């Protein structure tokens, strides 16, 4: 039988994982071609050397309780490169001062008034305390915006000072743009099971306290993972953009190249997906157009190692506060300091407020310096700096997002699959999982064709 040919469009973590999983599934004889027009692979995973130390300037951590990343690292022989966070906790900047991250919450949604003490006023604390006694109606399967549910049950202060900072850090969005089932699926599930109030649902959803670290990273940065995936997938990398996809799986690139494939995986952002499948998969095209994304910018700094930052992993900024940054990560506190410099990064940009698109590098650096004075009272003299922009890289998981994704996938023809951060979660583990699902889909479709 003639060896099969596979094409993967997109060279980020989703595309590289898809290529690796394909190679695992189909063996050495098949041809796997990966299209990525950028001068590097990895997408929003980008490791650079700042102050002589490797630092991730895109995604920088993964949740350890999810199995995908530890399993993938083990397959690639990289388990010994996995790092765990030091245990330093983030703070919230609200009301012009720093507060501990509220305990016993799920994405900032409280399980009791005590978890919000010091962060919200007494009237809001009383409202949280009385929430369980107030009438509450929940429709099984519903997916409200987080802000709508939380503001109704607890008031605007809980949204602005507790929930928004966490969701802004994860999605570059807000409680108004993210649906409950994406942000807090365990809370939605508890409500579906019959929880009688939101505080009751949060208590049911709280994960058991393991005492262990929550986040992981890689010694040497995500580049270590990218190199491993490229090496093991043995792809043919075409540095060109695919501009047209035709049935029978003919791909045309921007140079005029024409490529034939038995199966295709589109590991591109939703807007590009919509353009590529227009005329091929109308349901998928329509669903993909419903998914919007935010842009962000990261300012990375290396400062002298003795700079007097507080002992925390960083700061999440409430949306109604004066700092321009949405989050500050004290990377050397979070992962442990190496060498004689301390590394930190400031993230800018929320959905609807996107300085990544408008501010100059000099403006972002000036904002970073001002924000460090405002939040920490520390004026820094960086020894190295870097600015990176991530344009439309943060999909917004709005209300009903899971239904949109289900429709998007249902409209795909056999032997065409999708992978990406807009599908099953924005984090790296979710991207790894979605890539595996895409590969399984096209392999099963090809096997079914042979069986017929």
From Swiss-Prot:
Belongs to the protoporphyrinogen/coproporphyrinogen oxidase family. Coproporphyrinogen III oxidase subfamily. GO terms for biological process: heme biosynthetic process. The lineage of its organism: Bacteria, Bacillati, Actinomycetota, Actinomycetes, Mycobacteriales. It comes from Mycobacterium tuberculosis (strain ATCC 25618 / H37Rv). Binds 1 FAD per subunit. Its EC number is 1.3.3.15. This is Coproporphyrinogen III oxidase. It is found in: Cytoplasm. The keyword Repeat does not apply. InterPro entries: Amino_oxidase (IPR002937), FAD/NAD-bd_sf (IPR036188), Protoporphyrinogen_oxidase (IPR004572), Zeta_carotene_desat/Oxidored (IPR050464). FAD binds at residues 10-15, 36-37, 58-61, 242, 390, 426-428. It comes from the Bacteria. GO terms for cellular component: cytoplasm. Involved in coproporphyrin-dependent heme b biosynthesis. Catalyzes the oxidation of coproporphyrinogen III to coproporphyrin III. GO terms for molecular function: oxidoreductase activity; oxygen-dependent protoporphyrinogen oxidase activity. The keyword Flavoprotein applies. Its cofactor is FAD. It catalyses: coproporphyrinogen III + 3 O2 = coproporphyrin III + 3 H2O2. Pathway: Porphyrin-containing compound metabolism; protoheme biosynthesis. Pfam families: Amino_oxidase. Keywords: Cytoplasm, FAD, Flavoprotein, Heme biosynthesis, Oxidoreductase.
